[in-house]
Regions:
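Phosphate-binding glycine-rich loop
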Residues: 61-102
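Conserved beta-strand segments of alpha/beta enzyme cores
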Residues: 25, 78, 123-125
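A general structural signal for well-ordered alpha-helical segments in protein cores
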Residues: 6, 39-43, 61-65, 89, ...
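PLP-dependent aminotransferase-like
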Residues: 95-129
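Short glycine-rich anion-binding loops that position phosphate/pyrophosphate groups of nucleotides
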Residues: 32-35, 85-86, 110
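N-terminal "arm"/small-domain region of PLP-dependent enzymes with the aminotransferase-like
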Residues: 1-55
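Hydrophobic residues at beta-strand termini and immediately following loops
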Residues: 29, 56, 82, 127-128
Length: 129
């Protein structure tokens, strides 16, 4: 199937996680690992939602956005919920960047910015810190 890939995709380098030290019980905060177990009741709450996983959820996540907005004291339309930070970055780049509107970012930043820019053919202006 790779013969059908675009040149952009076929030259894409696979993600390589940051330095992986071989130390027992090491918690890699830079990889979003958490040293603590879920709060009490989380497993039961998750188990109670398993049946609904076969259905599409509310794509606007209106109830979740309203709850977050109320907690933060902002309007629900100021909240973006997505399937993780990578999806939200993708949505933001689609909304605000293109060939004529490059992404400006610091030289020391999240390593997925240049990958998304390459995939979406968005110029990236890197600002040294």
């Amino acid at each position: 199937m790779s013969r059908y890939f675009t040149s952009t995709l076929s030259t894409l380098e696979p993600y390589t996680p940051g330095e992986q030290l071989k130390i027992d019980n090491l918690v890699k905060l830079n990889a979003n690992e958490n040293p603590y177990p879920p709060a009490p009741g989380v497993a039961a709450a998750v188990a109670g939602t398993v049946d609904g996983l076969r259905l599409y959820s509310d794509l606007t996540e209106a109830d979740l956005c309203a709850a977050i907005a109320a907690h933060c004291g902002v309007a629900p339309e100021n909240i973006l919920c997505g399937n993780g930070s990578d999806e939200n970055l993708l949505l933001a780049l689609r909304a605000f960047c293109d060939q004529t509107h490059p992404l400006a970012s610091a030289d020391i930043t999240y390593s997925f910015y240049p990958v998304l820019c390459d995939l979406m053919h968005i110029p990236q202006h890197i600002i040294p810190l």
